[in-house]
Amino acid sequence: SDKDHRFDVQTSDGITVSAYGTEFNVQAYAEEPDIKATLAEGHIQIDQINQSASQELIPGEQAVYSRHTQQMQVRKANLLVETAWKDGKLVFRRTPMEEIAKQLSRHFNVNIQLQGKEIFDYTYSATFTTETLAEILSLLEKTAPIRCEIIEPQQQNDLAFTRKKVIIRKR
């Protein structure tokens, strides 16, 4: 978009993000409890359905709308982490294993299952650019006592294939 012509992104929850000459990111995954809008440069305005007030962001800010409470909060954003995907990167900064699993699942179109409550306590800081899923999992295994098992897609009776699956458990 440019400064004179706005570009709107609407989510199914009635959130509209209007951009004016800007670089921004909106995350509105159905399975996630929050909707996030992050501004890298330019100007965005966020409107909620049935709300008269709108929220404006300045570069470096992120608005987080809770689907549960239907409240919005603005906080400082880590732009490296929030916008890395557009350059094909996966960037994690003290990121919990559960969030890493979600991002790897989306990025590589696989089903990742975490087994064992201690797995959820692990956090990682890493940047991945050209690594394959197998390479990333191998690196994760080297830095924590975990084991990653990759289960390749299987053909079912209806000739469809299952999704590739990864099971991560404690060693």
Q: What positions do the PLM features span?
A:
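N-terminal export/assembly leaders
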Residues: 70-171
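Short, small/hydrophobic-biased targeting/export segments
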Residues: 1-70
